[in-house]
Amino acid sequence: MGGELVTGLGALRRRKRLLEQEKRVAGWALVLAGTGIGLMVLHAEMLWFLGCKWVLYLLLVKCLITLSTAFLLCLIVVFHAKEVQLFMTDNGLRDWRVALTRRQVAQILLELLVCGVHPVPLRSPHCALAGEATDAQPWPGFLGEGEALLSLAMLLRLYLVPRAVLLRSGVLLNASYRSIGALNQVRFRHWFVAKLYMNTHPGRLLLGLTLGLWLTTAWVLSVAERQAVNATGHLTDTLWLIPITFLTIGYGDVVPGTMWGKIVCLCTGVMGVCCTALLVAVVARKLEFNKAEKHVHNFMMDIHYAKEMKESAARLLQEAWMYYKHTRRKDSRAARRHQRKMLAAIHTFRQVRLKHRKLREQVNSMVDISKMHMILCDLQLGLSSSHRALEKRIDGLAGKLDALTELLGTALQQQQLPEPSQEAT
């Protein structure tokens, strides 16, 4: 990965080429990871429904899983090699050992470990009780505990999805994004792309995330519960239990019976709370007024509060006059009644004035930025026009000085020339 140093436009071309290669490698790695997970699901379901009748096909599926895993590990190494080359291009390095840090080596080894975990085709499937059920074990034979853990651990390969989405989003390949992000010190990583899609396509993102979590956790729960005593291992039951747990309702009609099933349900509840919070945030943002609607609403509320203030002030004057009138007539009962109405009118007037003041403060805080922008634009326009007028006046003054200099020079030359009579004498 070493070589001669490339600078300038060649470095930019090489960076773009490396990013394109990274995008293709990440895409193929995700395809191989998804293929391995699909083959793992196929192997588990074939073992459950078909048993030992299809042992040869089960062994063939496990061999295909191993083959896809080997290709996936090669692509992981190639991807990190491209990452090292990209780091060398950005920092002007020649030796790849300088670019390869201990943290990156640990990350590569961890990814190889995560992607290399799979059920190895070394022995025949565990189907001693396939197709038959006894009182001690009401379910047929299924995956062993170790093989089930290895199969479920293959779902950790889904960490490749954010990487592929980041490289496919075009953020890293867009020069405008990179330049503006560098000026504002913004790092374009996975969280930025997640926020970007949450702002542009919130409905699709939440729907895909929710359905993906439901289906994945439902299948994981069914695998964990299939050899339990209760009937929660059926996929139909888990497809009912997971959404109810995800939505934090929990009717209690279907419950997990194993420790792993309870852990899956607990994680599902936590994920449901997080997705519900995201959904509430998206819905709240969608229900907000836009700028034009907010201005119209505030304008109409301003008129409404001003009208209420006038009515409250008029009612206050009316009740004050009636209180004064009945006090002069010494009608204490009517005076007390109008005094109570006068105090109520004072309270109403104060409440309406407070609401009107809060509305004005809110409108001022909304208009501050746009108003400041307009003021700055007007100030810049005024300064530009004043500068141009000053330049014109300076140019005119310079022209007049040149003309005055020419006149003075001409006058001095005429004074220095002798008269003809003096030349004749």
Swiss-Prot record:
The keyword Protease does not apply. GO terms for molecular function: calcium-activated potassium channel activity; calmodulin binding; intermediate conductance calcium-activated potassium channel activity; potassium channel activity; protein homodimerization activity; protein phosphatase binding; small conductance calcium-activated potassium channel activity. The channel is inhibited by clotrimazole and charybdotoxin but is insensitive to apamin. One of its GO terms (cellular component) is vesicle. InterPro entries: CaM-bd_dom, CaM-bd_dom_sf, K_chnl_Ca-activ_SK, K_chnl_dom. The chain crosses the membrane at residues 30-50, 59-79, 105-121, 141-161, 205-225, 263-283. GO terms for biological process: calcium ion transport; cell volume homeostasis; establishment of localization in cell; immune system process; macropinocytosis; phospholipid translocation; positive regulation of protein secretion; positive regulation of T cell receptor signaling pathway. Pfam families: CaMBD, Ion_trans_2, SK_channel. The modification Phosphohistidine is found at H356. Phosphorylation at His-356 by NDKB activates the intermediate conductance calcium-activated potassium channel activity, and conversely it's dephosphorylation by PHPT1 inhibits this activity. Residues 284-345 are annotated as: Calmodulin-binding. Keywords: Calmodulin-binding, Cell membrane, Cell projection, Immunity, Ion channel, Ion transport, Membrane, Phosphoprotein, Transmembrane, Transmembrane helix, Transport. It is a multi-pass membrane protein. Residues 239-259 dip into the membrane without crossing it. Homodimer. Homotetramer. Heterotetramer of potassium channel proteins. Interacts with MTMR6; this interaction leads to selective dephosphorylation of PI(3)P in a lipid microdomain adjacent to KCNN4, resulting in a decrease of intermediate conductance calcium-activated potassium channel activity. Interacts (via the C-tail domain) with CALM1; the calmodulin binding is constitutive, does not require calcium and mediates calcium-dependent gating and four calmodulin molecules bind to one channel tetramer. Belongs to the potassium channel KCNN family. KCa3.1/KCNN4 subfamily. Transmembrane helices S5 and S6 form the ion channel pore, which is surrounded bymembrane embedded helices S1 to S4. The S4-S5 linker, which contains two distinct helices, undergoes conformational changes upon calmodulin binding to open the channel pore. Intermediate conductance calcium-activated potassium channel that mediates the voltage-independent transmembrane transfer of potassium across the cell membrane through a constitutive interaction with calmodulin which binds the intracellular calcium allowing its opening. The current is characterized by a voltage-independent activation, an intracellular calcium concentration increase-dependent activation and a single-channel conductance of about 25 picosiemens. This is Intermediate conductance calcium-activated potassium channel protein 4.
